[in-house]
Structure formats: structure tokens, C-alpha cells
């Protein structure tokens, strides 16, 4: 930490705000430690924050995760004002999920309350939180993906153009998105047409604390009223119509449970987790689990269940494995790709391989090579062509997958892994494999 942050940091620590936020589980804790090398003259403190098991990004969150992060941000502002402080920004990238809920990880996001100044994070909050939540709730939940394109938040004029006309009846959305976008356009026009480079830009009017509090409360009310209910999609209902009889399902669950107890991993990634049944088996084995699925309804149901049951070892995430989050931002160095964030000890890939290899035409050796980048140990289920689910996939297309056999699967995966164990799942034609990555 440089000396330019000294006054605000000292205020955070002396005002009692830090203790309140940490005690309520709203902020990661930190320790002040000795600097690792000779500090510069600008050095003030070296902080060692509590570590986050998995760093996620807003475009990987389900609706309720983004909503909870938005409500946390507004709660942080309210608590900060009670301690004569304020948030300097409202970036969702300052929020991570820890022990089942959102927390702020940026200790330096707080400053001494700037008397009379408008709430500076207002635009950022509307672009990063209110606009995507409104679009997901009022138009289409898949519009969350715009956050992957617009790293600085969804432009408000774009959000306004995408929202249905009936949203004009919603006062909060009309004010904070449509009128806000119109003000931005007029502000930019005024700034660009003023004569001379030194012409004064339009000045914001002073805003009292009461007015800032009212603004924050109005945003909070707007966010709380936005909702999205996961409908019965193909994937959300997948487990109720899977290929397993009760005995087969229990055998598969038992095999997965036994493997995980034997492996005792610290972190597990469950790819294609659906609503998280096997993620919870991994969590019961003591692992911290990241539970990925491409279906917004599955991720939403998974998160709601985890939140309801206070499952603090489980983190649901929205991710399309055949189009995973890439490295983004300047020089591809601001947001890491999924593979760059891989810290799992074990990857679960259950009832998944046929969707990747057949539905998406990904060669088996390529699947194996990518999974080997994610973890040293793999627990994967092979689903043969004779399985009803694969028959359904092939019913409307030509079978151009001659190597999609058990022998072809093993040959492809042995290029990247050593097959340690293969167990036929009782009452089915599926096989569960335990594999270890080759050196």
C-alpha cells in the first residue's frame, strides 16, 4: 500500500468499520505483515488478505449471485456512511464468494466521506449491477453474457434500448437506466461541444448525506424488486429423467463418494454439475467445491439451495465448458481464463463426455488434454452409444463418431492420463474411471 492511501486506510481501521464488516462476514480479513523486499519511499503498509479458494467473475454468476453482490455493495455503502466513510467505486470485481456468500476483497475501496460530493460509484453500480439484473429479469437471463463483452459494465443506452417498453412503468428502472442514459448523452454532448480544450465541463451539484442515503436506498429497493425464477429447462429437469434406475444411481453415488473419501481433495471442480448433487457429495467429503453448469436455471437452483442450507463449501458457477471464460482485458491480463485459475485437486466429469464429444464435435484427445490442464486427478464417466441419452443425441444427426467407443475413449485419454481404475456402474452400460494426469 502506498502512502497516498494512508489516511483512508487509517480511517478504515480506527473508525470501527473494518471490525464491523469482518465480524459480519462482509469483508475478507487481513494481516499487516513485513514487506517482502526493501520498500520504496512511497510504501506505507503491506497487507496479507484472507485467501479466496476460487476467483470468479460477474459473467460467471447466476442471477441471484449478481443480485446478492449488488445488495452487498449497497449495504457496504450504508455501513460505511455510519462510520463517516464511503465506497470509492462499486465494481463487482471487488466482490468474491466466500463461505457461501459475497464478500468485498478490496480493503482500499473505502475513503473518508467526501462531504457534499455526489455518490461517485453511482454510474458504475448502474452499469455493473442494475442494468444486467434488469435485463436478465425483464428481457432474457442470457443477457448476463454482455458483461463478458463490456468489462466496464453494460452501457446504459444499450440497456435502455434492450429493456421492454413496459419497463418504463417501473419508476426506478426509468430513472436509473433510461433517464440516466439520457443524462450521460447530454453530458457528453455538452463536454464535446464546449469551445476550447479548457472549457469547463458541466459541474455536478453538491449532494447532502441524506440525499446520498436516499439514492442508495432507492437503488436497494430497485434491486430487491428484480427477480428471475428458473423455469423447468431441459437441464434443470435432467436428473429427474436420467438413464439410471434407483439401484444404478445409488451405486454411482457410492462409487463417487468412496473415491472422494479416498482421495481427500482440498478443492474439487464439478463440470456439468446440473443442480449440484455430486458437488454436494464432494463437499460432504470435506472439499471446497466449484460447481459449474452452462444452464442458468441449474446454476440458479444450485445457488439458491446452497444459500438456503448454508452450504459454505459449495460455489455454483455459470459456465459453458465448450466456450469457457477466456483471458480478457488489456493484454489479456486483467481477467484470467478458466484454465489459468485452475487449482483443483480433482475434476468430476460425470454424464458429460457425450455432450462435449457428440453434441459439440470435440475430439476425445482434445477433451482429455483440456481436462488434464484443470486438475491432476480426474473422475470421469463414459457413456456409450447404447445409452438412451446418447441415442437421443444421435437420433437427429448422422453418426460420424466411429472412435466414440469405450476402447477409443480409453486410447484417447491415455495420451494425457494414466487410467488407475475403471468400474462398471451396476445396472447400466456406463463406466466410472479414476485417472491421474501423466507427468
Where in the sequence are the language-model features?
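Conserved class I S-adenosyl-L-methionine
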Residues: 264-274
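Conserved SAM-binding motif I beta-strand of class I
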Residues: 288-293
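A conserved beta-strand element that flanks and buttresses the S-adenosyl-L-methionine
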Residues: 348
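Conserved beta-strand signature within the Rossmann-like core of class I S-adenosyl-L-methionine
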Residues: 370-385
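Conserved SAM-binding loop of SAM-dependent methyltransferases across substrates and taxa
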Residues: 275-287
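S-adenosyl-L-methionine
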Residues: 303-341
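Catalytic activation segment of kinase domains across protein kinase-like and atypical kinase folds
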Residues: 86, 91-139
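A short, conserved alpha-helix within the catalytic core of class I
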Residues: 355-371
